[in-house]
Design a protein with these regions (language model features):
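Alpha-helix capping/helix-boundary segments
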Residues: 19, 112-113, 234, 252-253, ...
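Mature extracytoplasmic/periplasmic domains
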Residues: 274, 278, 283-341
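Conserved C-terminal helix/tail region of periplasmic/extracytoplasmic solute-binding proteins
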Residues: 337-372
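A ligand-binding cleft/hinge motif common to bilobed small-molecule-binding domains
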Residues: 112-116, 244-263
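Extracytoplasmic ligand-binding site segments that recognize negatively charged/polar headgroups
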Residues: 55-69, 81-97, 101-242
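Short, low-complexity disordered leader/linker segments with a strong preference
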Residues: 1-51, 366-372
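A short alpha-helix/helix-coil micro-patch that ends at or immediately precedes a cysteine
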Residues: 68-76
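Periplasmic-binding protein-like
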Residues: 152, 216-221, 227-228, 260-284
Length: 372
């Protein structure tokens, strides 16, 4: 059931099957351990089961978050609670709770806010055994504070029916978005609440340089009707026609198309684009450190990532032993067709870049930045 408070939702998942619990009482691991978790230490599993519970803050889509938490509970007999929060909301929450977090692990969402948390010493380093499954060390933090699980491509989603009705061509480049003909037709997300928006800011700075990027955002803002709370917000508005052009991750657009919105076209910007690494991490000072470590090991296995596409998430996976979602390639996406994104610059400067973004826009945009 849901427990709603402020902007947060929390679901208590049911306990694992009674048989699993009985086996655990007698010191036996559930049979499911023999699947993809075979490299996980028996001592870690036992220590995690003794703690008995885990709280997850999730920044991926809730359908996948719920499934991943339920799978972990079924595998290990550990009670899981979760909250679905945007990445910036998680960062704000753990900053306020520094040293005594109410959650144990962070799951999903772009790594720009994760890197802010690394810089603020809010994440616990952990050398995961299953990190050997990563296709490249580029998909983990150099200090082992977070590990990547998926990769999402940034781009545009457009409502082809509305564009045709308006007699407009679809934008093909980032600069196209500033054309006067798109006034009031575009939605982005709010960098105060969504890591996706921070990625957009970093991407433009890396592609254009800082000052030119700020001028770009001033021009783009004239065409933006709303900055949504969630990074996936624009994708959900395109199909129904609430916005004509949404900027966000293209896997969110795939989900909308498969939900029946065949009026959506996905566009990879011709002048280049960047990507998110969706990650997972342990909060420093968490109440259940062994269960948190076990979660990291689990997240780096097919048991966790292969169920993403079964639950509406079609990002590319960054584990060598995972099965890529065929839907991503069917819609023409290429996980390697991206710029060489500078994560260090993003980590060191994103807070200042967000301040500069709002300073460039001034007060005129305030009522368009959604927080609910």
């Amino acid at each position: 059931m849901y427990e709603i408070g402020g902007f947060y939702m929390k679901r208590k998942l049911s306990l694992a099957l009674a048989g699993t619990m009985i086996l655990s009482l007698f010191g036996f691991a559930p049979a499911a351990f023999a699947n993809d978790a075979e490299s996980i230490s028996d001592d870690l599993v036992k220590a995690a089961q003794e703690e008995g519970e885990l709280t997850v803050y999730g920044s991926c889509e809730e359908e996948y978050l719920a499934a991943a938490c339920q799978k972990f509970e079924d595998l290990y007999g550990i009670k899981v609670s979760y909250q679905r929060l945007s990445t910036s909301e998680v960062y704000t929450k753990i900053s306020e709770e520094a040293g005594n977090p109410s959650g144990d692990v962070w799951f999903g969402g772009t790594t720009d806010p994760y890197n802010e948390a690394v810089a603020a010493d809010l994440l616990e380093p952990y050398e995961a055994e299953n990190a050997v499954n990563l296709i490249s060390d580029d998909y983990k933090d150099p200090t082992n504070c977070w590990y990547g699980i998926y990769k999402g491509i940034l781009g545009f989603m457009v409502n082809t029916e509305e564009l045709e009705r308006l007699g407009l061509e679809a934008p093909r480049t980032w600069d196209d978005l500033t054309k006067e003909e798109y006034q009031g037709l575009i939605m982005l997300s709010n960098p105060n609440t969504a890591g996706t928006a921070k990625l957009v800011i970093n991407t433009m700075i890396q592609m254009k340089g800082h000052d030119e990027a700020m001028e770009y955002f001033k021009a783009l803002d004239k065409n933006v009707s709303q900055y949504t709370k969630s990074g996936s917000g624009p994708s959900k508005m395109v199909g129904p026609g609430e916005c004509v052009i949404g900027v966000g991750f293209l896997h969110d657009g795939i989900y909308q198309i498969l939900q029946g919105y065949d009026n959506i076209e996905l566009i990879v910007p011709e002048d280049g684009t960047s990507f998110e690494i969706g990650a997972t991490a342990i909060f420093k000072g968490c109440a259940h450190p062994n269960a948190a470590k076990l979660w990291i090991e689990y997240a780096l296995t097919p048991d966790c990532v292969n169920i993403a596409k079964e639950n509406g998430s079609y990002q590319f996976l960054v584990l060598s032993n995972a099965t890529q979602p065929e839907e991503a390639e069917q819609f023409g996406l290429d996980m390697n067709n991206t710029i060489d994104y500078d994560f260090e610059d993003a980590k060191n400067n994103i807070a200042q870049y967000v301040e500069d973004f709002f300073a460039a826009l001034g007060d005129s945009a305030d009522d368009r930045f959604m927080t609910e």
